[in-house]
Amino acid sequence: MKKPLRWLAALTALLLPLSALAQQQGLTIDIVGGSASATPIAVIPMPYQGSGTAPQTDVSAVVGADLDRSGQFRTLPAAQIVEKPTRGTEVQFQTWRTLKQNYIVVGRVMDAGEGAYRVEYELFDVAKGERMLGLAMTARANAMRDVSHQMADAIYEKITGVRGAFWTRIAYVTASGKGGAMRYALMVADSDGYNPQTIVRSAEPLLSPNWSPDGKKLAYVSFERGNSSIYLQDIATGARELVSSFRGINGAPSFSPDGRRLALALSRSGNPEIYVMDLGSKQLTQLTNHFGIDTEPTWAPDGGSIYFTSDRGGRPQIYQVAASGGSANRVTFQGNYNATASVSFDGKKIAVAQGSGNTYRIAMMDRSLGSPSWSTLSPGSLDESPSFAPNASMVLYAAREGGRGVLYAVSSDARVRQRLVLADGDVREPAWGPYRTAH
């Protein structure tokens, strides 16, 4: 863990602690935890019933993997799927009651013309023998994973009442080479690590990616000009804009919920303070003015205030200040080190990197019932950079493991953890993107 403040120390060192990797490789998922209390669900293989070439994507496998990694569900192993219905009329509910499954998903893939496919699927409550969901989706071959994630989202929401977040993306930073030959890349991938896309490459460090609320742009820090600078980049076109390159530190950008403003940490006056930039006029408003180090701003969901990390009390803690400025209030009191806040969509939960001695873990403060309660989400010793999924069901974070950087996603109740790892190399600085919209 970089101390006293993770982001500031990274800036002053001008170096990310990353080792060699192959940038072309995507992240792969390894589920390293599970929960016996997860809801049993059978996701039956969905065969291709067309006359052409079958899609390469195994739809049911993607749906099942999504549900598994949510921590809310436990899919029936393939070896125990004794019957393979493809439509509701073929389901023998007593079979699945005997196998103690609460739900069953069946479906099939057909041709839709012009190289596209049509997926029809149904969700059933096994105990009641009733259909809960029946939908059809059409997509070309290269979008079948997207369709699969959307199916998982619909199933998740129908059962839990919470919008699914499988059809989302994550951003992260990788690096290749060693010493002076280090090369950095800002990447975007699906939430399960597939379909990696390089957003920008640089011979200098890249830090702090942050998504615009519409998911179309990333703000990030680059050192390509010799000093830290903040850029906005369009993910689809690659067009980018330099928005902050003041003397000293330009860091930790964070889009406002309406996408019109950017919170950032600047030391243009000599000491790191929190500012807000109007992205239309580029006008700056200084929110804090303190001799302590103020950094790592992140917006409250309503856009009315900003959380940030400050050591003004002697040790790093999370504070909150109105988006228009004013006095700041301390938010965290549990432990001696709380930094890098991520706030859930409803503002009731705050995930932080929490330190004790030389150990840093991801912890969550939950204010759903009024008084704050704390839980530890990660078991590592150098865990940092928490980032909530848009539905707050999971938290993505960075860890050091075996001398290299990996990402983990943990369910917000800490029941299930999954590792997102490169076969050879490091990955850091994760940021979970917003919901996507079908066009």
From Swiss-Prot:
Gene3D superfamilies to which the protein is assigned, alphabetical: TolB, C-terminal domain (2.120.10.30), TolB, N-terminal domain (3.40.50.10070)
Domain of life from the UniProt record: Bacteria
InterPro entries referenced in this protein's UniProt entry, alphabetically: 6-blade_b-propeller_TolB-like, PD40, Tol-Pal_TolB, TolB_N
Record's keyword terms, sorted: Cell cycle, Cell division, Periplasm, Signal
Main location: periplasm
One GO BP annotation of this record: cell division
Any one Gene Ontology cellular component term annotated for this protein: periplasmic space
Location of this chain's protein in the cell: Periplasm
Signal peptide (residue range): 1-22
Pfam family, one: TolB_N
Function description: Part of the Tol-Pal system, which plays a role in outer membrane invagination during cell division and is important for maintaining outer membrane integrity.
Known partners and oligomeric status: The Tol-Pal system is composed of five core proteins: the inner membrane proteins TolA, TolQ and TolR, the periplasmic protein TolB and the outer membrane protein Pal. They form a network linking the inner and outer membranes and the peptidoglycan layer.
Entry-linked NCBIfam families: propeller_TolB
Similarity annotation: Belongs to the TolB family.
Protein name in UniProt: Tol-Pal system protein TolB
Organism name: Xanthomonas euvesicatoria pv. vesicatoria (strain 85-10) (Xanthomonas campestris pv. vesicatoria)
Phylogenetic lineage: Bacteria, Pseudomonadati, Pseudomonadota, Gammaproteobacteria, Lysobacterales
Encoding gene per record: tolB
